[in-house]
Amino acid sequence: MGIRKKLKKKICEYLLKKEIFTSTKTDVNKILSFLNMVRPSPLDIENIRVGGDNDGGYVVPNDFQGIKYCFSPGVGSISKFENDLTKKKIKCFLADYSVNPKFENNLIDFDKKFIGASSYENYLNLNDWIEKKLDGESNNDLMLQMDIEGDEYEVINSLNDKTLKKFRIILIEFHQLHYLFDNFMFKQIDKAFKKIMKLFHCTHIHPNNSVDFIFEDKNIIIPPLLEFSFLRKDRGNIIDKNLS
């Protein structure tokens, strides 16, 4: 994580701990409706863990057959997840301007760029990045694994539906979820999740193991970091609607 993003994270945590909001507080009913929207659905496809048991691993719907590529913006010190995917013959495209990793795996391709909502300077728009890497190849079964320190909302909201539908599986670490209590930020977060939930089932939610700060208001407790797993709706069926 770059210095700018570390500072931004600390400022956000400080403001929320002091109950300082950039706008009005979000109505509690809106938050409850949001939480109901994103809760996981029991599907006829099991989840398995890919990558490490701690940071670097994800709980993923076990539906890999036919997936050729995974796009993975945000690169950590451990890339066990991507290495495990390559054992399934899935090529992984990684991007992050803040690191200089060395990979000896020919199924891992790295770009020294941040992935953002638009392409400029050291940033590359996700739509543009995917088009560049696929180079005209028609592929409607990709994976997206994203950990970009709070920029995920702008990136998701900038995605066109054509690109979003190409992903069969989406794994995202969502940051700054404590800002659901801030009405302005709630709108941005809610918009991104509604875009995903229109096309995908949520299959799993897991708090990040490194979280040391949790925000609570009106008996609603929200960690700032949650890992979400999604499966495109045409790939799985809800097995018990009473639990969904």
PLM-predicted stretches and their roles:
Residues 1-244:
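Phosphate/nucleotide-binding beta-alpha loop and adjacent structural elements of enzyme active sites
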